[in-house]
Amino acid sequence: MAKEGKRIRAAREGIEATKLYALDEAIKLVKERATAKFDETVEVSMNLGVDPRHADQMVRGVCNLPNGSGRTVRVAVFARGAKADDARAAGADIVGAEDLLEIVQGGKIEFDRCIATPDMMPLVGRLGKVLGPRGLMPNPKVGTVTMDVKGAVAGAKGGSVEFRVEKAGIVHAGVGKVSFDADKLVENIKAFADAVAKAKPAGAKGTYVQRIAVTSTMGPGVKVEPNTVLTA
């Protein structure tokens, strides 16, 4: 533990706790301090001026990262017939209907994204208590209930990320790996921030985007000046 504490303290050196860094400078600091023996994920977190306990202040959506996320996404699709064939052709890892329902009910959830055609939702609805708490329940608002299963699978595999504000008003996502070029991470973060900005709910009052920070899996957080992230 002492060794870990020393590593964390060393990583924080050179980062001013109260300073708001320009996005490109923040990314440079994050990349320099990512010293783990694996390719750490770069994550962005945004504190929003919303109270998600109120329905008119809920923030959720999906963002297609222009440079991908760098992670392997396992996709399950509930579909039948031609749509099931489309899902398999697009690279879905698991495709099924009642058979897939039984697998999930049995506790075997080996996927990161779940997609369903609209006609399958009465079936998928039975899995609400299983998929809901894991953030895996298909939802038309984020494009995971759709007839375009081929496009949805391709998007999930290609780097689309779903986001949903948490109780404290925070939304976050992995936006790449530390091995990515800095400019690609900047592009991904700006795309994500823009998607969150466009998802601003009608009930939001005051300053919507209040704070932004970036970090890596094992690294310290770096506060970012919002004006260097938001493009609009």
Swiss-Prot record:
Quaternary context: Part of the 50S ribosomal subunit.
This protein's name: Large ribosomal subunit protein uL1
Primary role: Binds directly to 23S rRNA. The L1 stalk is quite mobile in the ribosome, and is involved in E site tRNA release. Protein L1 is also a translational repressor protein, it controls the translation of the L11 operon by binding to its mRNA.
Keywords, sorted A to Z: Repressor, Ribonucleoprotein, Ribosomal protein, RNA-binding, rRNA-binding, Translation regulation, tRNA-binding
Organism this protein belongs to: Methylobacterium radiotolerans (strain ATCC 27329 / DSM 1819 / JCM 2831 / NBRC 15690 / NCIMB 10815 / 0-1)
PROSITE patterns with a match to the protein in the record: RIBOSOMAL_L1 (PS01199)
Lineage of the species this protein comes from: Bacteria, Pseudomonadati, Pseudomonadota, Alphaproteobacteria, Hyphomicrobiales
InterPro entries, per the entry: Ribosom_uL1_bac-type (IPR005878), Ribosomal_uL1 (IPR002143), Ribosomal_uL1-like (IPR023674), Ribosomal_uL1/biogenesis (IPR028364), Ribosomal_uL1_3-a/b-sand (IPR016095), Ribosomal_uL1_CS (IPR023673)
GO cellular component, one term: cytosolic large ribosomal subunit
Family per record: Belongs to the universal ribosomal protein uL1 family.
Entries under CDD domains matching the protein: Ribosomal_L1 (cd00403)
